[in-house]
């Protein structure tokens, strides 16, 4: 079976989407058919135009295919909008309904909310009177999650921007390539260690499968920026380079070559801020299994013992094209069992980082239980090859069972930004960058650098 690359770009163009929709009860009470200006546009403004706007921002390297601020475009895409809503393709969010209210930037839609936009489409996607939006001018600013600033970065104007010193060329013959590349820091821009409060990765295109870095987190399709709670942060030592592991994935063949200029932006804490919790991460990969050919519901399980009291900040499930569902659970020392995250319909193109609104306390002696399900059958239309026996591996046509977590010990460090940095924190941050650099095969297309699979999981 010939493999077809599944990219968010292709999926987005074939089934365009809304970011999320909400509607007031008054809209449902109208006797006449809903109109764009009176009913649809206010909903788009409040929940969708952060992405669906002219020259909209990239999310995981992808830009929304239409602007929902424009009536002509919204009407043109109206049938697809309806399809995206009723099929559950949008809003893009993997966490089960049971988690409503737990995570930041959640995207859920009520039945009556969906009904209003479907009614607008079924009623002929009527335009209505532009004056009907006069009282809705403030809705964008008030919407949860906000609208991307004029800077083009979700985090706002960065304190530091880094990028490759030259475009990375991904040749025609390449399907999967995982080089490690250095991003030079502009001279004089980073002369002392800084505490990162927010970090944003801007992949150069949909062929960027992932980006892994010690200081800026992980970039995968559909994932937004890292924004740490007040008093939480990551130390970025002064250095002329930031080293990143890239994974490029595309269909090989004549004319398929691409060039990448991935960027990253950082916001730093101001002097005087107190850092109580230094963020740590663990990939928690699980290997040593084989998915049989044609198996529609293959399950693997793993555990991780928590050795000290921690605050769990966020969770990031990761599988490839056969990924079907994923669950994090915890068994507390007293035997109580709790589901931390249930993703019943995993989508490789929307690999969210599920961040708690309030970091969750997990006491020492707790055990995390992770379960992954895979669909290697012909019923999975994204399956590269249902006849293959599939193992854990780095290529996109392999599979992975990773359960990355971000967390911090509960003991407060009380580190004052601009003051002395504890030796253990500085040493760890410097070692992470140096280790990544020493393991790297910098821009050597003869070899992949797969060290990221084990570096933070030992």
Language-model segments: what does each one mean?
Residues 22, 28, 450-453:
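Hydrophobic/aromatic hotspots within intrinsically disordered, low-complexity regions
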Residues 11-25:
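Bacterial N-terminal signal peptides
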Residues 120, 146-413:
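His-enriched metal-coordination microenvironments in redox/metal-binding proteins
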Residues 442-458:
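Long, low-complexity, intrinsically disordered segments
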């Amino acid at each position: 079976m010939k493999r077809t690359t599944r990219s968010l770009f292709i999926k987005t163009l074939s089934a365009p989407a809304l970011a999320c929709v909400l509607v007031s009860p008054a809209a449902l009470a109208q006797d006449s058919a809903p109109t764009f200006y009176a009913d649809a546009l206010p909903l788009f403004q409040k929940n969708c135009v952060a992405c669906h706007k002219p020259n909209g921002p990239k999310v995981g390297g992808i830009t929304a295919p239409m602007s929902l601020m424009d009536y002509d475009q919204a009407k043109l895409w109206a049938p697809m909008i309806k399809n995206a809503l009723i099929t559950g393709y949008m809003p893009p969010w993997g966490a089960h309904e049971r988690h409503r209210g737990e995570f930041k930037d959640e995207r859920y839609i009520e039945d009556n909310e969906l009904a209003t936009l479907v009614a607008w489409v079924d009623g002929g996607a009527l335009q209505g009177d532009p004056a009907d939006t006069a009282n809705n001018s403030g809705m964008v600013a008030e919407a949860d999650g906000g609208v991307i600033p004029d800077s083009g970065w979700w985090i706002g104007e960065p304190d530091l921007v880094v990028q490759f010193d030259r475009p990375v060329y991904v040749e025609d013959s390449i399907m999967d390539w995982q080089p490690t590349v250095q991003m030079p820091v502009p001279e004089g821009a980073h002369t002392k260690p800084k505490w990162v409060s927010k970090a944003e990765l801007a992949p150069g295109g949909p062929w960027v499968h992932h980006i892994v870095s010690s200081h800026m987190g992980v970039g995968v399709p559909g994932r937004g920026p890292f924004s740490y709670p007040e008093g939480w942060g990551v130390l970025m030592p002064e250095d002329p380079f930031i080293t990143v592991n890239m994974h490029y994935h595309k269909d090989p063949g004549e004319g398929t070559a691409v060039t990448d200029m991935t960027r990253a932006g950082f916001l730093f804490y101001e002097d005087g801020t107190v850092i109580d919790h230094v963020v740590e991460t663990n990939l928690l990969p699980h290997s040593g299994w084989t998915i049989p050919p044609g198996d529609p519901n293959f399950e693997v399980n793993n555990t991780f013992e928590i050795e000290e009291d921690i605050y769990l900040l966020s969770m990031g499930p990761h599988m490839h094209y056969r990924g079907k569902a994923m669950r994090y659970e915890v068994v507390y020392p007293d035997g109580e069992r709790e589901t931390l995250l249930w993703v019943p319909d995993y989508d490789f193109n929307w690999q969210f980082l599920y961040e708690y609104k309030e970091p969750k306390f997990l006491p020492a002696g707790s055990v995390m239980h992770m379960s992954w399900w895979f669909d290697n059958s012909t019923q999975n239309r994204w399956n590269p090859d249902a006849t293959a026996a599939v193992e854990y591996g780095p290529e996109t046509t392999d599979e992975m069972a990773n359960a990355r977590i971000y967390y911090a010990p509960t003991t407060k460090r009380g580190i004052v930004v601009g003051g002395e940095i504890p030796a253990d924190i500085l040493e760890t941050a410097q070692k992470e960058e140096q280790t990544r650099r020493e393991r790297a095969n910098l821009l050597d297309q003869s070899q992949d650098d797969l060290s990221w699979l084990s570096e933070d999981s030992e």
